[in-house]
Every structure is written in structure tokens, then in C-alpha cells.
UniProtKB/Swiss-Prot annotation:
Family per record: Belongs to the scoloptoxin-19 family.
Signal peptide: 1-7
Species in which this protein is naturally found: Thereuopoda longicornis
Cell compartments where the protein resides: Secreted
This protein's name: U-scoloptoxin(19)-Tl1a
Tissue: Expressed by the venom gland.
Amino acid sequence: RPKPSSSGSWSFTYVMEPNCAKTGGVCGLYEYCPEHRRQEKGLCGENWSNQGVECCSGIPLNVKDCRTRGGQCTSKCGNAPFDEEPTCPEGEKCCFYE
């Protein structure tokens, strides 16, 4: 849900809504969901859709925090998928374990 950023302004990351979650998605700002990950419109409910929030089959691109993305910061990921984009301490990657 909307939360204050470090600058004090409000930002939106994502929210779980049942209809979207059933498709494996999360509700996030439509503009931050890559085109190939956009789900059917309206799965997040009318109230959210009116605010530019739609169902995305991945974590929206504006979410940079590793834990929020479902990962864990560590220096070695082994064979696990990883992302160097989210915020992790220097020398660590955001690893996604099952």
C-alpha cells in the first residue's frame, strides 16, 4: 500500500489482491509493469484501477528492495536465480531461493 519514501512523499510499491494473486500476480502501478507481464485489467478491483494499479505477473520495476521482491541479500547465490538491481550491501546480490 502507499507508504512514505525517504523524502517524505508518498510512493506505491504493490499490494496483494485475491483475484490477481490467483493468477500468480501482484497489484502494482501499471506504468512499472513490463508489457509482457501485464495481466487482464480489473483484477485488482475498481478502487485500485482508478489509481493506475493493475495486475502484474512479476514484482513491478519500481520495487528495488530485495526482501520486498522476495529475495535475500547474500554474497553467493549458488545456482539460484539472482538480480543485481535491488538494493543490497556492496558485494552482495539479491538471490531468489524457493
